[in-house]
């Protein structure tokens, strides 16, 4: 697969929920960029398509000034890049304050973050970032299993993620986590489910969102699939994993839950999973019992 190397100043990715947000590039690429399952900024041989860079503050300010001139007021603002929280705290604070100063009635300010970026910042720094106007942070938990995280080169572990998640919430910033169904493959599916539910219970994030693993020939995990070292779960198993994660959550978990991605096999949402747990599970069980899912096979691109 041919992909063109792009400048860090070119915005490529944002969460689906930020589809109608104003995108402001703060960083380019990803400071880690080693996860096997991810092809956002690299290819299957780890060739980099977009270098990691903290963009100059003057460049960021110009984007904000341009947006103000064009009348982009009253929008959510998404600070784009693989992990803008890797930027120095004062750099990030200046950007957030400038957004709030130049754009009227900003609905929210949000960004991606890595858990390690959060752990490198003090509680005081995170509180200052919150006070400057950052409302929500998106973080890829992917799995609570240390085995799965290690195999996938995630560069962190469950305990570190729990600490990072709690730091974000303690600072008053909303935390939205991503859970990647199927990431353990067939071999580690049960461990992936149990440990992910455990970590979600420990953190009790504001929101968590399910995603379904997709593997194509342009990501490193493709090699494991070809060699037989990784086996994709069947379509119905994505629903089973989701059901079992929900079923194993502790009674303290009051998170909002979303399936807001086109790659998912169903769309269910809850504004409080503690309140909606029984109905959520009932709906998933109805899908799991559907004969169409039981006979469906995952198509793998060649």
Give residue spans per PLM region.
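Conserved, mostly hydrophobic/aromatic
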Residues: 30, 38, 79, 111, ...
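Canonical Radical SAM [4Fe-4S] cluster-binding loop centered on the CxxxCxxC motif
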Residues: 9-59
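A short acidic, helix-capping loop that chelates divalent metal ions and anchors anionic groups
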Residues: 46-47, 146-151, 220, 266-268
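Catalytic cores of alpha/beta
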Residues: 124-125, 185-202
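Hydrophobic faces of well-ordered beta-strands that scaffold small-molecule active sites
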Residues: 22-24, 75-77, 109-111, 137-139, ...
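Conserved strand-turn element in the central/C-terminal portion of the radical SAM core barrel
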Residues: 38, 116, 140, 144-148, ...
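Conserved SAM/AdoMet-binding glycine-rich loop
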Residues: 66-170
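Auxiliary Fe-S-binding modules of radical SAM enzymes
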Residues: 1-18, 201-302
